[in-house]
Structures are given as C-alpha cells and as structure tokens.
C-alpha cells in the first residue's frame, strides 16, 4: 500500500488552498484540482511528509498542522493509497507560490462545485473548514 500525506490550508474567509494539476497524461489525475500533498518517503512520518509537500508545492511553512482524517482511496491505476490529511490556518503573512501544477489559489467551497477534483477532496475540504471554524 502506498501512503500519501496532504494539507488543507484554510484562510480566514473559509476558503481552501487548491492546486490545479498540470494537464499531462503522464501524471495521476491530470487537469484536476487538489490540495497540496504527495507520497510519504521512506523513514518519514506522516506529518513531516505533509509539511514537506506543502512547502515544496507552495513555499508555505505551516505553524501548526491538525490531523483531519486517514482513509483509503483508489488512484487512476487502481492502486490503493492510504492518505493522511492535515489542515492548518493560513497566517496571511507568507506568500503562496505555485511551485507545482498550473495554478495555486484559494477557492470558496462553492467554487469546488463543477471542478474536477481528486476523489473525496470536496468532502475533506468542507470538513477542514468546519474544523477551522471551531478555533
């Protein structure tokens, strides 16, 4: 089983940071939207993997990561991935960069409707925003 880790960054408006993946047939989920994340490397714990992926893809260094969920999903090649998802609040100080994909931006939850998203990501974004409202 492959392990993945990701971070849903929520801003003060309740928007979530999403990446528009490149439209290349050689990658998984081309031309889809997703939150920052990727594979967990050998000898790396899930939180460290999530932090690394977030920084690599956006340049953003999160202060606190809160665990959101661990669950399985199927990739386009039918491989099962165990994803370890965290969430954090955007500090409004650091610039968000697009170091991977074609675009990186905060989207309102309503804007996720009609977009091609990775499996289960809309539900997880809603869940992260609900958790953020409790802080």
Show which residues each predicted segment covers.
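Conserved Nudix-box catalytic region and its N-terminal flanking loop in Nudix hydrolases
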Residues: 15-56
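Surface-exposed, flexible loop/turn segments at secondary-structure boundaries
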Residues: 13-15, 24, 73, 112
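Unchanged
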Residues: 39-63, 69-124
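Short connector loops at helix/strand junctions that flank enzyme active sites
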Residues: 2, 30-35, 79-83
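Charged phosphate-binding loop/patch that engages nucleotide di/tri-phosphates or the phosphate backbone
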Residues: 121-135
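Conserved hydrophobic "DFG−1" position in protein kinase catalytic cores
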Residues: 9-10, 18, 88, 106
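Conserved N-terminal beta-strand and adjoining loop/helix that marks the start
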Residues: 1-17, 36
């Amino acid at each position: 089983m492959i392990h993945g880790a990701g971070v849903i960054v929520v801003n003060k408006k309740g928007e979530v940071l999403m990446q528009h993946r490149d439209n290349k047939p050689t990658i998984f989920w081309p031309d889809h939207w997703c939150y920052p994340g990727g594979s967990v490397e050998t000898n790396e714990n899930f939180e460290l993997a999530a932090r690394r992926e977030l920084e690599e893809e956006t340049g953003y260094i999160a202060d606190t990561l809160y665990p959101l969920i661990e669950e399985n999903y199927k990739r386009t090649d039918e491989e099962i991935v165990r994803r370890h998802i965290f969430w954090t609040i955007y500090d409004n100080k650091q610039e968000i960069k697009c170091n991977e994909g074609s675009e990186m931006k905060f989207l309102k939850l309503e804007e996720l409707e009609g977009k091609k998203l990775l499996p289960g990501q809309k539900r997880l974004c809603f869940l992260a925003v609900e958790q953020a409202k409790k802080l």
